[in-house]
């Protein structure tokens, strides 16, 4: 038994047999690429949701592994035949869904069975929701890590979002984002009709495209719906794209460009230098 199996079986809630609700307003889009050994675990975590919705796979690297996994779970596969790249693949994934709510599920990650149930509850409670996001844990070497320096810093940054009133404040969310990005991209569900038309992510970014998107969305009137429960597990491993891009300093360059949207040049450089130390938490 792989360690990843151990994490999945012990950290994911079991769905009651009576959980047969289907929500036609939501779609899970799994971004799949290469030969990930974790893809099936991701799919199973979505199938175990207490509220069911549509699941599909989007990929720019079709292969036998992805095809067999899709066939085994009876999932449709959408192939991106246009421009490739991590950001382009995310935009393509969003375009494959035709529902009000869309969650981009990263193939290496897993979701607690109550994720969608809590997401829909939170979104229904907001007058004009923009995105939903939750707290999360990391998966390192097959083990669940609920707290480390990086996670603790992010949770402190997210404290203002515990207030439903402050979730609606453009000022507050921009002050939070001016210090970095505490929002974990795989934990986000997008309310597509309430977001600007056009690509959700800027294709000139390769690793900070999520933070760049939050910065643009933060200017819009509406709600950043936050759930403090640990509703998903984000896998950290050497082969991940994020880890590779940190190694070649891509993230440093992109994050500095975003800090400049909030701060004068010298202040942006100083803050980025402090923020860069947090990148070490994404290395194995």
Where are the regions that the model predicts?
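Short, acidic, metal-binding catalytic loop of nucleotide-sugar glycosyltransferases
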Residues: 44-53
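A conserved acidic beta->alpha catalytic loop
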Residues: 58-67, 106
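N-proximal low-complexity "stem/linker" segments adjacent to membrane-targeting elements
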Residues: 1-45
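Short aromatic/hydrophobic "clamp" motif used to bind/position activated sugar donors
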Residues: 102
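Conserved donor NDP-sugar-binding/catalytic core segment of glycosyltransferases
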Residues: 114-154
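Glycine-rich, basic loop-to-helix element that forms the pyrophosphate-binding segment
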Residues: 81-97
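Acidic donor-diphosphate engagement hotspot in glycosyltransferases and nucleotidyltransferases
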Residues: 90, 111-119, 142-143, 209, ...
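Conserved nucleotide-sugar donor-binding catalytic segment
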Residues: 29, 160-251
């Amino acid at each position: 038994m792989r360690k990843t199996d151990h994490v999945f079986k012990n950290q994911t809630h079991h769905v009651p047999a009576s959980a047969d609700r289907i929500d036609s307003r939501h779609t899970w889009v799994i971004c799949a690429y290469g030969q990930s050994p974790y893809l099936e675990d991701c799919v199973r975590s979505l199938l175990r949701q207490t509220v069911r919705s549509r699941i599909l796979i989007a990929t720019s690297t079709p292969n036998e592994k992805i095809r067999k996994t899709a066939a085994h779970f009876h999932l449709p596969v959408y192939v991106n035949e246009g421009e490739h790249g991590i950001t382009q693949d995310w935009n393509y994934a969003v375009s494959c869904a035709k529902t009000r709510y869309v969650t981009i599920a990263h193939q290496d990650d897993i979701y607690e069975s109550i994720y969608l149930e809590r997401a829909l509850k939170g979104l229904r409670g907001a007058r004009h929701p923009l995105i939903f996001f939750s707290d999360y844990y990391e998966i390192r070497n097959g083990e669940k890590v609920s707290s480390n320096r990086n996670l603790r810093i992010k949770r402190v940054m997210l404290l203002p979002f515990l207030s439903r009133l402050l979730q609606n404040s453009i000022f507050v969310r921009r002050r939070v984002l001016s210090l970095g990005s505490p929002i974990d991209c795989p934990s986000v569900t997008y309310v597509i009709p309430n977001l600007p038309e056009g690509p959700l992510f800027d294709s000139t970014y390769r690793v900070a495209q999520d933070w760049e998107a939050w910065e643009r969305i933060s200017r819009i009137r509406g709600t950043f719906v936050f759930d403090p429960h640990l509703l998903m597990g984000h896998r950290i491993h050497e082969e991940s794209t994020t880890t590779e891009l940190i190694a070649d300093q891509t993230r440093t360059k992109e994050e500095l460009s975003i800090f400049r949207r909030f701060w004068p040049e010298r202040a942006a450089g100083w803050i980025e230098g402090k923020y860069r130390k947090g990148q070490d938490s994404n290395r194995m």
